[in-house]
Amino acid sequence: MLKENLSFIGVCALVFAALLGLAYLFERTVCHDLQRRSRSRNISYVAMFSALGGVLMLLEIPLFFAPGFYKMDLSELPVLMSAFYLGPVAGVITELLKVLLKLLLKGTSTAFVGDFANFVVGCTFVLPAAVIYHHHKTRRTAIVGMAVGTLCMTVFGSLFNALYLIPKFAELFHLPIDQIVAMGTAVNKGITSVPTLVLFAVVPVSYTHLRAHETCADLV
């Protein structure tokens, strides 16, 4: 069990480093419009957006079409605002701090798998949206960025769930994958396998996610 947990922590650290490096690369090569602000002001903004995201992450919304371990929240809204206002690097850091704050306030009910998924999948939404928005700052590019981010989140999130998160969840909880699929079947008879679990539970969340965050375009 200890070996499994250490391996999972190592994967989390590597993924964070990779996403942070990718965000830095985008910021240096694409986002030339970023205003120079004092480090203390940037830290203040990141702290504010992270705190708001952490609180919103506590307000989880159950999904009638998915098993209980899939929930939705509006915590990506302040993360997206952070990335739009401060850049992709700030977005990734805000995403991480938001999840850590939620863990401090509430802990985890998914052996950290759900929290890791929230961070990674959130970054696949925020990074493309921020890069496109900073290429040309308009309401239209904000909407296009969120649409592209949602597409990236849907494709990556589906593959990530099917190939890593669901098997890892089963491994850490010592559950057969068939039992996890059965949780989905109890909610939706169309869920009979991991691919259909992803199709009917993960993909609809992405569309709902986009609709819920469209208001961010009116704030930029």
Language-model segments: which ranges?
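Short helix-perturbing small/polar motifs within transmembrane alpha-helices
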Residues: 19-36, 45-55, 115-165
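Feature marks short, highly hydrophobic, charge-poor N-terminal signal-anchor/signal peptide-like helices
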Residues: 2-8
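Hydrophobic transmembrane alpha-helices
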Residues: 11-82, 89-90
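Conserved small/polar residues in nucleotide/adenosyl-binding loops
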Residues: 208-215
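Alpha-helix-centered segments that form part of catalytic cores
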Residues: 188-206
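Juxtamembrane non-transmembrane "cap" segments at the membrane-aqueous interface
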Residues: 160-187
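Interfacial aromatic-anchored transmembrane helix boundaries in multi-pass membrane proteins
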Residues: 3, 57-74, 96-132, 144, ...
